[in-house]
Regions:
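Repeat-blade elements of multi-bladed beta-propeller folds
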Residues: 26-57, 71-97, 124-158, 170-198, ...
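Conserved acidic E/D residue at the C-terminus of a beta-strand in Rossmann-like folds
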Residues: 449-454
Length: 1008
């Protein structure tokens, strides 16, 4: 079978603050297909295999591996079905729950759980916004399931009767992921991915209580205990059933139970424990066996003759569960991958005993016993055993479906117009097969074929499965009625097949993303233009003026936000969140994620990763509040500049190719600050010791420990220069002192550069040029330079004894805003000064104390936001207050009520971004304060994930982009992923966002 497409990628590589050199993944249910052996009503044994790769549930003959039947779905099937009375119940990422007769695969019923929105991109696959990411459980006469991952978009807990009729439905505030469990006490236990499980009442869906957990989707019930994990450190913990008391912790990813015992496996040993003693809080080990197994485990047999099967890399071990004696180790070829899941069936009327294993590369293996009842060593392949073969660009595809030369030529012209070879493509027509085959061989696009009816869809799916392309490169969707199943602005390429198109251009063009291509049925090629006037986030704080406002009118006018895509860049390549790394960037067709030592190009329309560029050694700079931006995008989003150690790099932002570089050309200097506008680059040079660039753990620890304290040193440069965008020199200025990067701001329209220059002798003689602000202020000047020639337009002595922690400059419409802070009695006090653009003379000054106490989560280094609201007025959002930019007087933001202050509803590290009437920040979750909202609570938690510790929520291009930045987080957030939301206008709310109401049972049980 094709290699599984797991729902989530690799975890972060560790956590500096927690001294973890690795972090275990917590959601691994679909790392491999989960086999299930079950008998139908006649006693016939079926091997059921769900596929997360090619979107189906298979029934195979466990003796031969031949297919009995299959049920195709509209998305990945990630969980094994539940079986009751010869019926299999399961869900899929298409948001539907199905009941299928086991004997012949007949569909008994099918229900969509959520509102049935158009499909979005989820980790590279087109799925429902409300995927079924739990198992479907049959218990207490009901069928239970959960749909959705994002409470802001609706997550639903439902119960159907066994005929598919809705019994109850609840909208919940959790992100449900994992196998549902039940007891005879009318309770259903629900895992929530990386977070903690909870219990609900099976009668009406009421939430009863949370269960403590180290976090993770593994859960197991015994009569007296609840087991949950694996947490960050691969440990499963046991609790009393109500979760009131933790009993024991076991170093293991999986636990099996039976016959009054439990068995654990951790990669070095398998151990057996007395379950009754565990319930009393005693970890009594009955036996242990050295073993590399750490994946799935099964216990089978009679209570006095139990057998244990354990999966690991390269083998399945068969152990006497009573004594720990290794009976046999069943070898698995290494190129088959790691054995993850197991299924076993005892001998019965349907045939002999069989053991089944699946691997993370998609292999499905079966062993049959010898006459003695011991599994033999003959390996029988129950399905195609080799990993999929993907055609490389330029390799001819299926000869039997060679397209006409005219189609080949038209497709070549269309793909030449693409901004990137990667992305999503849609092919529609009465016979799309040839065009899809051609695009498979010539591009890297994920291709969607649109079928007119189920018969055509089934035929196309079988063809591409036979080519081992289905799910990996190609999927087929059926057009149901007039409504497209996809979100708009999603596809990079849409193809109308010549002479066979059944859709009009005005139906297809909305599906094409800006910059994407539509190929007409007559061969004409049309590129979709970009909308004008949308905002961008090209520099660290949006633009070189450092306003932290992208000016995006669509995001700023939003009444709500709709999920567009999630997935893509995950935590494994991102810097430790505590390092407060640089912001992501986005303009036009590009998004740039500044990962740990690499730049990653992402398509903002659908989350496709386009490229990765490895930066020179020690280019990655940390602790952004004390530094400044060193990577920026051009206004059209087509090129990206990066000041990397000894060179400034110019890259193609759409392809990741190096176009040009500029050496530093000065001994013992490195490139520092960088900004770009019009035809110019503003650059600085610094000492190699100035930035925080260490790669060793001991030094990095100071970035987390020391640099979250007060009065930390700022990164400074010694020279400033301006070049053309082609790196041609215009002018350079040897500074009269040191230039802290946070104090640099540039207005390319007005032609001015503003900076703070520290000229004291102690600064000039400093050895590292990483200097505390109080020392910089000993003899500091605010300087304004002419951008054209570098001449000093004016300078003013800057006397500011209160400036202790941080320094920011912003070029606002009303003047130059300087921000600093000091720490007093456990609280941050902020100081602001507005000065004239033309003279540097003071206009106003103010100070305020932060409303929250504490100085260990960055409370003293918040960056202010200069917000141009929808009424056209610019206001200073200096947390927690709002000020008139012109006078410095306190005021109300447009849309807010009297006595307003910004009080984030949750943990408040990180700083603000915004546009229009919307503010974005961390409040435990990525949160929007929507001042357009007519709701009583204007705050919306967009996702059950953790934002970064500085800025990673950026409004740009008519989208709200939230690339992953929580790497190293060990807390219990359900999701850890990149996100994109689209703004929804007030007039579109009813059509674009629908939240289903709760439905309660008709006959509620009497209260207990």
């Amino acid at each position: 079978m094709p290699s599984p497409r797991a729902s989530w990628g690799k975890p972060a590589r560790g956590s500096v603050w927690q001294n973890l050199t690795s972090i275990e993944p917590r959601v691994t249910d679909d790392r491999a297909n989960v086999p299930l052996l079950a008998r139908d009503g006649s006693g016939r044994l079926h091997l059921l295999v769900p596929s997360s790769a090619d979107d189906r549930l298979l029934s195979l003959d466990p003796q031969s591996g031949k297919k009995n039947w299959q049920i195709e779905t509209g998305g990945p099937v990630r969980y094994a079905p539940s079986i009751l009375d010869g019926v299999a119940y399961f869900g899929a990422d298409d948001g539907r729950v199905r009941a299928v007769r086991l004997s012949d695969g007949k569909r008994m019923w099918e229900q969509t759980v959520g509102p049935g929105y158009r499909e979005i991109v989820g980790n590279g696959r087109l799925i429902s916004p409300h995927p079924i990411r739990t198992s479907v459980l049959v218990q207490h006469g009901k069928v239970f399931a959960h749909a959705g991952l994002f409470p802001s978009q609706g997550v639903y807990s439902v119960a159907f009767d066994r005929n598919g009729e809705l019994v109850w439905r609840r909208k919940i505030e959790s992100s449900s992921q994992g196998y549902l469990l039940a007891t005879g006490k009318n309770r259903v236990y629900v895992p929530t991915g990386r977070s903690v499980p909870y219990a609900l009442d099976s009668a009406d869906g009421r939430k009863l209580f949370d269960l403590p957990s180290p976090g993770g989707s593994f859960c197991m019930l015994t009569p007296d205990l609840f087991f949950t994990g694996p947490g960050n450190a691969s440990s499963v913990e046991s609790y009393t059933e109500k979760g009131r008391a933790r009993m024991l912790s076991f170093k293991a990813r999986h636990v099996a139970a039976g016959g009054g015992r439990i068995w654990t496996a951790n990669g070095s040993r398998i151990a057996c424990h007395d379950l009754a003693k565990v319930a009393e809080g005693q970890q009594t080990t009955l036996w242990q066996l050295e073993s590399k197994s750490q994946n799935g485990m099964l216990v089978t047999g009679e209570p006095q003759n139990l057998r244990l099967f354990a999966a690991g890399e390269g083998s399945v071990e068969f152990v006497n569960a009573d004594t720990g004696e290794l009976i046999q180790s069943l070898a698995v070829p290494r190129d088959y991958g790691e054995v993850i899941n197991l299924a076993v069936s005892a001998k019965g009327e349907g045939g002999e005993e069989v053991l089944v294993a699946t691997t993370d590369r998609g292999h499905l293996l079966a062993w049959h016993p010898s006459r003695t009842g011991t599994p033999g060593t003959d390996l029988k392949k129950a399905a195609p055993a080799r990993a999929p073969v993907v055609h490389s660009p330029g390799v001819p595809a299926d000869d039997s479906a060679r397209p006409k030369q005219s189609l080949v030529d038209s497709l070549a012209r269309a793909t030449e117009r693409l901004q990137s070879a990667s992305g999503f493509g849609l092919v529609e027509g009465r016979n799309p097969r040839a065009a899809i085959e051609q695009l498979v061989s010539t591009t890297k696009l994920q291709l969607v074929g649109l079928a007119r009816n189920e018969e055509q869809a089934r035929s196309l799916r079988e063809h591409f499965r036979s080519r081992q392309l289905y799910g990996l490169r190609v999927i087929i969707k059926r057009l149901e009625g007039d409504r497209f199943p996809f979100e708009s602005n999603l596809f990079n390429l849409v193809v109308q097949c010549p002479e066979s198109s059944f859709l009009a251009e005005d139906q297809l063009l909305p599906l094409v993303c800006e910059g994407g291509v539509l190929m007409h049925s007559d061969g004409r090629i049309r590129s979709k233009p970009f909308r004008e006037g949308l905002g961008s986030w090209r520099h660290q704080y949006a633009d070189p003026s450092n306003l932290a406002d992208s000016g995006d009118p669509e995001v700023g006018n939003a009444a709500a936000f709709k999920l567009k895509w999630f997935g893509g860049v995950g935590p494994s390549r991102m810097p430790d969140r505590h390092f407060r790394g640089p912001a992501p960037l986005s303009a036009g067709p590009a998004m740039i994620v500044q990962a740990d030592g690499v730049l990653i190009g992402v398509d903002p329309a659908n989350g496709t990763e386009r490229w990765q560029y490895q930066l020179p050694e020690k280019s990655m700079r940390y602790v952004t509040p004390y530094d400044g931006g060193y990577v920026c995008l051009t206004e059209n989003g087509e090129q990206v500049y990066a000041a990397c150690n000894e060179r400034v790099l110019l890259l193609d932002a759409l392809k990741g190719k190096l176009l040009k570089s500029l050496p530093v050309d000065v001994g013992e200097r490195r490139w520092g600050y960088l900004a770009q506008g019009k035809e110019e680059l503003v650059l600085t040079r610094m000492k190699p010791s100035a930035p925080r660039i260490a790669t060793d753990r001991k030094t990095q620890r100071t970035f987390v420990d020391q640099d979250y304290r007060s009065e930390r040193p700022l990164v400074c440069s010694r020279e400033i220069l301006v070049t053309g965008t082609d790196f041609g020199s215009k002018w350079q200025r040897e500074s009269l002192g040191l230039i802290p990067h946070g104090g640099i701001s540039v207005d390319f329209e007005e032609g001015r550069v503003v900076l703070v220059e520290a000229r004291s002798q102690s600064c000039l003689e400093h050895s590292t040029d990483r200097i505390p602000l109080a020392l910089l202020m000993e003899d500091a000047f605010l300087v304004c330079l002419d951008l054209d020639n570098g001449e000093t337009l004016w300078e003013k002595k800057l006397v500011w004894p209160e400036a202790k922690n941080v320094l920011y400059s912003q070029l606002t419409p009303e003047g130059i805003l300087l921000t600093s802070s000091e720490s007093l009695s456990g609280k941050a006090r902020y100081h602001f000064r507005m000065l004239s653009h033309s003279t540097g003379q003071p206009v106003w000054s103010l100070q305020h104390d932060h409303v929250k106490g504490g100085l260990y989560h960055g409370e003293q280094v918040h960056h202010p936001l200069v917000l141009r609201q929808n009424d056209g007025v610019c206001r200073l959002m200096a947390e927690p207050f709002c000020y008139e930019l012109k006078t410095g007087k306190k005021t109300l933001p447009s849309g807010m009520q009297k006595d307003w202050t910004l009080r984030r509803p949750g943990h408040s590290c990180g700083t603000l971004s915004g546009c229009g009437n919307c503010l974005f920040f961390r409040a435990s979750f990525p949160t929007v304060l929507n001042m357009n909202s007519k709701q009583s609570n204007p705050f919306t938690a967009l996702a059950p994930s953790r934002p970064g510790c500085w800025i990673n929520i950026i409004p740009a291009g008519g989208r709200l982009l939230i690339p992953e930045a929580s790497a190293s987080c060990v807390c219990k957030y359900s999701l850890q992923t990149s996100l994109c939301f689209e703004p929804v206008a007030e007039a579109e709310l009813d059509s674009e966002i629908s939240i289903l109401p709760d439905v309660l049972p008709k006959n509620l049980p009497s209260p207990k």
